[in-house]
Amino acid sequence: MNYEERDTYGIYKPRKNDGAGSRVDKGPGPNLMGADTLVGNDVYNQKDEDLGDIKEIMLDMRSGRIAYAVLSFGGFLGLGEKLFAVPWDALKLDTEHKRFVLNVAKDSLDGAPGFDRSDWPDMADPTWEKNIHAYYGTKPYTADVRTHR
C-alpha cells in the first residue's frame, strides 16, 4: 500500500489543471506528509526487493522529530514477523513508486537488530540508539536534543 491510497483527507490529490491538460499538484506532499498516511507504506531496497512495510512511526516527544519507522519483515499474517526500528534518516521517499527505499540487502535483515511485538526495546536508551544508528550508517540527532534542552 502507498501513501496516496491511505490519504483520506485529500493531502496528495491533484488539485487543478494547468489549462494545457496537465495536472498541477498543490498541497503539502511530498515535503510534508500526514503521519497516518505513512503507516502501511511499502519499503523496498535499491535492488527493488520488498523489505516489508511500515507498522509504526516513532516520534521523539522532546524534539518533535520522527526518530524511527518500525519496519515489519517476514512472517505471514503477523506470525513470525520481525520488527525493526529503522532510523528515519535511513529511509528515502521514492515519489515515483510511492514507497520508501532502505539501502540494505534483503538477506541482511535476518541478522539486523530487531525485536518482536511482545518485547519492544527501550528506544530512548543511548546505547541502544548508538547501536541502531551504527547498523544503518546514520548519525543520531539526539545529542543535539540533549544539549539544547
Where are these regions (language model features)?
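Peripheral interaction segments used for macromolecular assembly
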Residues: 1-149
